[in-house]
A protein has these predicted regions:
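Generic alpha-helical transmembrane segments
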Residues: 15-19, 37-58
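Catalytic core of nucleotidyl cyclases, primarily class III adenylyl/guanylyl cyclases
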Residues: 200-226, 242-281
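Hydrophobic transmembrane alpha-helices
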Residues: 52-61, 69-113
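Catalytic NTP-binding/metal-coordinating core of nucleotidyl cyclase/transferase enzymes
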Residues: 155-229
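Regulatory cytosolic signal-relay segments
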Residues: 97-158
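Membrane-anchoring hydrophobic segments
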Residues: 1-40
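Cytosolic regulatory/linker segments at or just downstream of nucleotide-handling modules
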Residues: 295-342
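Catalytic/regulatory signature loops of cyclic-dinucleotide turnover enzymes
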Residues: 260, 281-304
């Protein structure tokens, strides 16, 4: 199953569960009892909302991102109001007929204060869900839930793999395109990497200009060679879309990357702006490894210590390049260039 589809189906299931539970809570507060109607209505509303949000409106995500966040919420709230009315009406009719009622009873229910209180309740709930999903996108996949659960409020030492991915000849590209078009190129590229990121279970730590930093817990990063496969998946997507980049920007961006692993201190810092940061020697070392890519004419350089942890299959080739002492470091480091055979 494709990683994006798998992620969407998981989200859809979560939305349906939350919606059903919300229906039960509403009925408990309103009627002091529970029956299947609250679950049935909540499940169908959640399913409709999830399909609309994840499979229909998601196709227009880039257009929505151009809107101010407020108008993004307003437009979607209007759409959800329409969908809720379309879905809730037939369900109320079905329940009315099932319980021996008739059309007149349906119309009475449809224009009753109780029906509209359900609509308002559902609209508020789904607007909050959209708000959460959009904020989650803004701060980074999975980061918001870590804040909500208080993870990393106290510093934690953990072992992680890092990849520093950087555009080659970025200064030349920026001068050629101009600042506006250059950042449009970067934004388009950062959208391109979504599928490789999900497929290889990477976390996007930060964007720094034309550089993006990926991270994994070591166990996740080395499993199925995620920490190197992501690079080749990204390059493959660029190759598949090279004609589009040529037509739009007159070039196809090229990237280089350095990968290393080690211990870091992970913690939440800040007051007015709170972020989760990683602090450790591995960060500087990985950045230095990436800087050697141009010198050794290699697109993907990894440390010898990381290579020892990886079980490369016949798909990949790792060639020893050199033993170096990165700038500002006392210990030497073996560098290996990784290529993909096919």
């Amino acid at each position: 199953m494709q990683p994006v589809l798998k992620r969407k189906l998981k989200l859809l299931l979560t939305i349906c569960v939350i919606s059903s539970i919300s229906g039960v809570i509403y009925q408990l507060v309103d009627a002091d009892h529970i029956d299947f109607r609250s679950i049935y209505l909540g499940l169908n509303l959640g399913l409709s909302f999830g399909v609309l949000e994840l499979f229909i409106l998601d196709r227009y995500q880039q257009q929505f991102q151009k809107l101010p966040f407020f108008w993004h919420l307003v437009i979607k709230s209007i759409l959800y109001t329409i969908i809720i009315l379309i879905v809730a009406g037939p369900i109320v009719l079905l329940l009315e007929l099932r319980e021996g009622g008739d059309i007149s009873g349906f119309w009475n229910d449809l224009f009753s204060p109780g029906f509209y209180s359900i609509i308002v309740y559902a609209l508020i709930m789904y607007t909050l869900l959209v708000f959460y999903m959009q904020v989650n996108r803004m701060v980074g996949e999975g980061v918001l839930i870590k804040f909500l659960w208080g993870r990393y409020y106290k510093p934690v030492e953990e072992e992680r793999v890092f990849m520093f991915l950087d555009m080659k000849s970025s200064t030349t590209v920026a001068e050629r395109l101009g600042h506006q078009k250059y950042y449009a190129l970067l934004d388009e590229f950062y959208h391109e990497i979504s599928i490789p990121v999900l497929k290889n279970k990477a976390e996007i730590y930060q964007y720094v200009g034309d550089e993006v930093v990926f991270t994994w817990k070591t166990k996740t990063g080395i499993k199925n060679l995620h920490c190197i496969q992501i690079f080749f998946d990204i390059m493959e997507r660029l190759e598949q879309r090279q004609e589009k980049y040529h037509d739009k920007y007159g070039l196809v961006p090229e990237f280089k990357a350095g990968v290393h692993f080690g211990d870091v201190i992970t913690a939440k810092i800040g007051d007015l702006k709170r972020v989760i940061v990683y602090n450790g020697d591995v960060m500087n070392t990985t950045a230095r490894i990436q800087e050697f890519c141009n010198h050794y004419n290699c697109k993907l350089l990894i440390s010898g210590s990381l290579l020892d942890k990886l079980e490369l299959d016949e798909t990949y080739s790792a060639s020893f390049i050199d033993t170096v002492k990165p700038r500002g470091k006392e210990t030497e480091l073996d560098l290996h260039c990784v290529t993909k055979k096919y």
